[in-house]
Structure formats: C-alpha cells, structure tokens
C-alpha cells in the first residue's frame, strides 16, 4: 500500500519531477534514472536510460520512465521518441530480479502493476517510437525494444537480444508472448520462448526481432534518419493504423490485468521459483567476483 501511495504521489508531481534546462536550443529534463532531451522544431525527443550498471527496471526506474513518457505524451510538440541507453554496452538488462526475490506478495503485485503500466503506455503510444539498441538487450530490455515501431541495433557480436525468461526459471507472461508472436511469427516465437534464445544482431535481423543492424557508431544517426522517414507520414493516419494493429493485443492484457497480477504474484512467490532466482543471483555474484 505504501508503494502504491508513493507512486501516485510521484505521478501527481510529474510536472515538477526532475530538472529542466535549455541546451543549445534544445530542452531537457532529467530524473535520476531517465534523461530526456527534446528538440522543439524537430518534434523529436531522445530518452536515455541511465540506471547503472545495467539499466535494470527497478520499481523506481519504472516509475520515472512512466512519468517521463507521460510528460512527452502531454507535450503536443513531440511527435517521436528515440529510446536508447546512456550505460556503455547495455541497452537494458530488463526487469530487476531483486524486485522479485525475497519480497512480500504486496511488493510483487505493485511491481508487476508498474511493469504492465509501462508496457501499455509504450505499446499503445501515439508517438513514433524508435529504439537505438546500443547494447545487450535481454528479457525486459527486449520487451522495451519490441514496443517500438522500429528497432535499430548495433552490430556488435557481444550484444544479444531476446526474451530469455525461461533460462532464469520463470515464464514470460501471455502479453510478452503475444507481442513476440506479432513481431516474429508463431513458430519462431514458440521456439525462442521455450529455449530462452538470445539472438546476435545478425540473427535478430534475420528473424525480425530488429529491423536494421548498423555499425555501433551509426546507431543514433540511423535512428534519427529512420525517425525522419516516419515523421513524413501524417500523424492521424499513422496513429489510427498503429491502433488498429495493436489494439487487440493491448486489450487482451487490459481485460485481464488483475488476474495477470494475481498469477504473477502467486507464481513468483513459489518456493521453487524463489530458489531458482536465488541460484541465478548467486551466479551473477560469482561472475562479478
């Protein structure tokens, strides 16, 4: 309950959260974990995740992300957003496992509600969303990219992307699955979800997880050129088409939100799942050590 109240307070204070300043004709506002730079005449904002070391989507990060996105949605001068990372070598490691391990059911429910909220806002946004994937993008990081209208990925063999939840001993929910199927087709999604496949840039391009792979130093310039192409389309026709393509998938979650939260809370609270998460987190500690 306290978490929910804190989030409502932050959202209510969204217009005051973070600092605003003008930089070389551009406007910017920043929260602790998200930096947004906007270019008024161009109608484009660049949203940078900066939650080091790996841009994990903690409850605080999800809240700040949602607030930043809400600000941009309410700014009628902004037509498109380029989503990228400020952390070297990582786009986003996805959901924060520490939010799903060793907590109480109320925390799990609140966390999952925030994950749902961010996904719905991204996936149904009227703005043009282009992801400049400049690092590794597993699990929830891949989810963020899949929400975008176009995905540009750096051609670096060290970077991978995919919904690899099964490798962690957890299951991607139905709305992750639905979006994956929409993007790469049923058979590819079925195989990738069961195996927890992390695709190299070339493999991701081949199956359709990303739309373009470019040299690492060209990711942002390519994202901008792609954005220019999309901005040439009248907003009303593009937005109606996007809504037509995505509404059924979004509605499928909307009508089952509470049940999905209950299912997640029940699943993640199981001793066997907590044990799997513990083992995975211990492996991560050993790698860091």
UniProtKB/Swiss-Prot annotation:
Pfam families: ECH_1
GO biological process terms, semicolon-separated: fatty acid beta-oxidation
Enzyme class: isomerase
Coiled-coil residues: none
Main location: mitochondrion
EC number in record: 5.3.3.8
Alphabetical UniProt keywords: Acetylation, Fatty acid metabolism, Isomerase, Lipid metabolism, Mitochondrion, Transit peptide
Mitochondrion listed as a keyword: yes
Sites bearing N6-succinyllysine, chain numbering: 48, 71, 222, 229, 255, 270, 275, 283
Top-level taxon of origin: Eukaryota
Site (Important for catalytic activity): 165
Targeting signal (transit peptide) range: 1-28
Keyword rRNA processing (UniProt): no
Residues reported in the UniProt entry to bind substrate: 93-97, 140, 164
Cellular compartment(s): Mitochondrion matrix
Annotated pathway: Lipid metabolism; fatty acid beta-oxidation
GO CC terms in record: mitochondrial inner membrane; mitochondrial matrix; mitochondrion
Subunit structure: Homotrimer.
Family in the record: Belongs to the enoyl-CoA hydratase/isomerase family.
Function field: Key enzyme of fatty acid beta-oxidation. Able to isomerize both 3-cis (3Z) and 3-trans (3E) double bonds into the 2-trans (2E) form in a range of enoyl-CoA species, with a preference for (3Z)-enoyl-CoAs over (3E)-enoyl-CoAs. The catalytic efficiency of this enzyme is not affected by the fatty acyl chain length.
Protein name: Enoyl-CoA delta isomerase 1, mitochondrial
Species in which this protein is naturally found: Mus musculus (Mouse)
Lineage of the organism: Eukaryota, Metazoa, Chordata, Craniata, Vertebrata
